[in-house]
Regions:
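Glycine-rich phosphate/pyrophosphate-binding beta-alpha loops
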Residues: 21-30, 117-121, 133-144
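N-terminal accessory/precursor segments of enzymes
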Residues: 22-44, 167-184
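Internal maturation/activation junctions in enzymes
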Residues: 45-135, 149
Length: 184
């Protein structure tokens, strides 16, 4: 912790319908969030929950193929390109044969009402917006806090495990994102 330094965040921008999407660059996966929304923008709204789940699953699976390419500035522009999203949407659409019932196939952890993530968003009268997402794991995380710091540690790194060396910043699928319409 003594070598940790907070860095200024880079904001990425995309579009969905008539709205602007603003999300964070790495270590957050804001580029992937933008890509998912832009791909979805090329589909009709699903008729029911099963279609919604299948559509979002396919779109997310397609977008996640680009996770490791976010560090390349040329690939990053392609990832958040609306034209690339249209191409990917066409690939997904062309592979769809039929809508299956997926509710019975979902792991129980995907449908559990018990959660351990808190998200807060607030705005003031001048339009300043702050969002905070905190995930520490079930039952208050590790139940360990450093004296004087005022926060609990996560129980597990879960999805953050990977090819990290000392000093690397762990990437996060948590991507604070703001949707803006008409400048608001």
């Amino acid at each position: 912790m003594k070598n940790y330094k907070a860095l200024e965040s880079k904001i990425l921008t995309g579009k969905y319908d008539d709205k602007n999407i603003h999300s964070l660059f790495l270590p957050s996966f804001g580029a992937i969030t933008i890509q998912i929304l832009q791909i979805l923008d090329h589909f009709k709204l699903p008729k029911n929950e099963n279609e919604w789940a299948l559509q979002h699953g396919r779109v997310t699976e397609k977008a996640y193929q680009f996770r490791d390419l976010q560090t390349d500035s040329i690939k990053l522009k392609e990832i958040i390109s609306y034209e690339k999203a249209e191409q990917l949407a066409n690939e997904i659409f062309n592979k769809q044969k039929e809508i299956l019932s997926v509710a019975d196939e979902m792991p129980i952890s995907w449908t559990s009402i018990d959660g351990h993530t808190t998200h807060l968003t607030t705005a003031d009268k001048w339009g300043n917006v702050v969002a905070l997402t905190q995930t520490i794991g079930p039952t208050m995380g590790s139940k360990v806090a450093s004296k004087g710091l005022g926060f609990l540690y996560a129980v597990t790194l879960g999805g953050y495990l990977g090819k990290y060396k000392p000093g690397d910043r762990a990437n996060s699928h948590i991507s604070p994102t703001f949707i803006e319409k008409n400048g608001k």
